[in-house]
């Protein structure tokens, strides 16, 4: 339960208590239950239409929030995962493969968090090593060769900062991806489905179209990290989250992303299928908008998109 959901938790407890009492004592409490359920729905709408940036950070980090592999079966047909970077090893924190979107062959790449403690250790909490980014680039170059559109799912706190990852060229692998992705001659569409953290997110995020789920975040550093750097106190993360403009709607206003995809009331985890279908619809729409461009125009469109991000005052 998240902090801002405590009022909902209390109402749910009352509903469960009344239901138990009704069954146990064979009394009719349905009217009271209906009133509480209506109250729960009103309170849920009230809370989720007035979320603060820190609230959205908490939702983006939920363990039960859908991952890349949760969405793929609903969006793509006949997905086949491909493994390895052909240099060192396969990285389970970065998954990729080939599937079909409405009958068209596409390449799918995404960061993959774990679903429980054991899985998180295997997936390294969604923080890819250099070989993860090199695997992603290998699949992107393959997609370019066979003229397959590329779809990427961003869901990471950041690239793994460990000693071994640095020794194997973490920064170089991400930098190479930025360079190579900028010139790919097939459509690239990216979506942030959870946390989009720093260069780890950008390593698969240089796309013609960048989308975000309503309760996802995209930032150069975590709110805790920013608070520690700016004010020497990570407990000021809530203030940092407000200041950094890391939510989907803020980033859309800044012109960094192209669209925000709404989530079911309560978050994407409340209805994975509904959320996946909304993502699929957005993917199809964005891909259709790029169909009229030549291969060179697709690459130029992406390059100019990122060249034009940002502003300055003379």
Swiss-Prot record:
Native organism: Staphylococcus aureus (strain MRSA252)
Compartments where found: Cytoplasm
Cellular-component GO terms for this entry: acetyl-CoA carboxylase complex
GO MF assignments: acetyl-CoA carboxylase activity; ATP binding; carboxyl- or carbamoyltransferase activity
Subunit details: Acetyl-CoA carboxylase is a heterohexamer composed of biotin carboxyl carrier protein (AccB), biotin carboxylase (AccC) and two subunits each of ACCase subunit alpha (AccA) and ACCase subunit beta (AccD).
Statement: the UniProt record of this protein carries the keyword ATP-binding: yes
Pfam families reported in the protein's UniProt record: ACCA
Keywords: ATP-binding, Cytoplasm, Fatty acid biosynthesis, Fatty acid metabolism, Lipid biosynthesis, Lipid metabolism, Nucleotide-binding, Transferase
Family under the similarity heading: Belongs to the AccA family.
Pathway(s) per entry: Lipid metabolism; malonyl-CoA biosynthesis; malonyl-CoA from acetyl-CoA: step 1/1
Protein known as: Acetyl-coenzyme A carboxylase carboxyl transferase subunit alpha
Catalysed conversion reaction: N(6)-carboxybiotinyl-L-lysyl-[protein] + acetyl-CoA = N(6)-biotinyl-L-lysyl-[protein] + malonyl-CoA
Broad enzyme group: transferase
The enzyme's E.C. designation: 2.1.3.15
Principal location class: cytoplasm
Annotated function: Component of the acetyl coenzyme A carboxylase (ACC) complex. First, biotin carboxylase catalyzes the carboxylation of biotin on its carrier protein (BCCP) and then the CO(2) group is transferred by the carboxyltransferase to acetyl-CoA to form malonyl-CoA.
GO biological process, one term: fatty acid biosynthetic process
CoA carboxyltransferase C-terminal domain location: 32-289
Keyword NAD: no
């Amino acid at each position: 339960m998240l902090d801002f959901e405590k009022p909902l938790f209390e109402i749910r407890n009352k509903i469960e208590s009344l239901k138990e009492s009704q069954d146990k004592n064979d009394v009719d409490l349905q009217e009271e239950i209906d009133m509480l359920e209506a109250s729960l729905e009103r309170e849920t709408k009230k809370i989720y239409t007035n979320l603060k940036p820190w609230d959205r950070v908490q939702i983006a980090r939920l363990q039960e929030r859908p991952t890349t592999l949760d969405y793929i079966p609903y969006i793509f047909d006949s997905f086949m995962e491909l493994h390895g970077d052909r240099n060192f090893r396969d990285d389970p924190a970065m998954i990729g493969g080939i599937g079909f979107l409405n009958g068209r062959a596409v390449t799918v790449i995404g960061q993959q968090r774990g679903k429980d403690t054991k899985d998180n250790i295997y997936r390294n909490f969604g923080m890819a090593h250099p070989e993860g980014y090199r695997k992603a680039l290998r699949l992107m170059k393959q997609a370019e060769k066979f003229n397959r559109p590329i779809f990427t799912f961003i869901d990471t706190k950041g690239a793994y900062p460990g000693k071994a990852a640095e020794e194997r060229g973490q920064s170089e692998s991400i930098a190479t991806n930025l360079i190579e992705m900028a010139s790919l001659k097939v459509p690239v569409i990216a979506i942030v489905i959870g946390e989009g953290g720093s260069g780890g997110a950008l390593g698969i995020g240089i796309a013609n179209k960048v989308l975000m789920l309503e309760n996802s975040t995209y930032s150069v550093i975590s709110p805790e990290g920013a608070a520690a750097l700016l004010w020497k106190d990570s407990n000021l993360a809530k203030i940092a989250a407000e200041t950094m403009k890391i939510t989907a709607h803020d980033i859309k206003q800044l012109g960094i992303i192209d669209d925000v995809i709404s989530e079911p009331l309560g978050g994407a985890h409340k209805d994975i299928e509904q959320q996946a279908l909304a993502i699929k619809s957005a993917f199809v729409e964005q891909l259709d908008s790029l169909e009229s461009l030549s291969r060179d125009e697709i690459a130029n469109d992406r390059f100019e998109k990122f060249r034009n991000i940002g502003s300055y005052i003379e």
